[in-house]
Amino acid sequence: MSRAVYLCGFMGCGKTTVGRVLADLLGTAYADMDAYIEKSEKMSIPQIFSDKGEEYFRDAETRAVEEMGKNGGVIACGGGAMLREKNADLAAENGVVVYIDTPYDICWERIKDDANRPIVAANTKESLGELYEKRKALYTAHSAFMVDGTGSPSQIAAQIAEFIKK
């Protein structure tokens, strides 16, 4: 498999967990975009947000979408990576974009206590729910395949693999 598989979706939808299972299933590499950005920027995501701002972070995401896609494999994107049209276009050029559609309440339960997510700490459940709804339309518009995120990681990965192999 030479083309990249970009997994997108809201924070806590299962991109990281499903991504690892999917990479094993496809016999390819797995990479996490946030970890890639932290390594290339030599600082944590919360540090980037506080020291350099969200716009700088979004620029780093654009570079990551382009650079990571050259290597193929399964890439778990940050929750906001597909917000920029350019990122979605680059991802579609380099591979296939898959949206893991997980209900907000499930995402919230997974992320509500995560100190490494600056956007969670700065918002209420309700305001993040509004953000979820706004982003859902973008994820849907930019993905080649949408998978139900309520199954087990292996079930979700199997559905994605079936789509990829078509």
Positions of predicted regions on the chain:
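Hydrophobic anchor at the beta1->P-loop junction of P-loop NTPases
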Residues: 7
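P-loop (Walker A) phosphate-binding loop of NTP-binding proteins
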Residues: 10
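ATP-binding Walker
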Residues: 13
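Walker A/P-loop
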Residues: 16
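NTP-dependent small-molecule kinase module
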Residues: 21, 25, 96, 134-166
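Post-Walker A helix-loop "phosphate-sensing" segment adjacent to the P-loop in P-loop NTPases
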Residues: 24-33
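ATP-dependent small-molecule kinase phosphotransfer cores
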Residues: 33-81, 85-92, 117, 125, ...
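A glycine- and Lys/Arg-enriched "phosphate-lid" helix/loop adjacent to the NTP-binding pocket
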Residues: 93-137
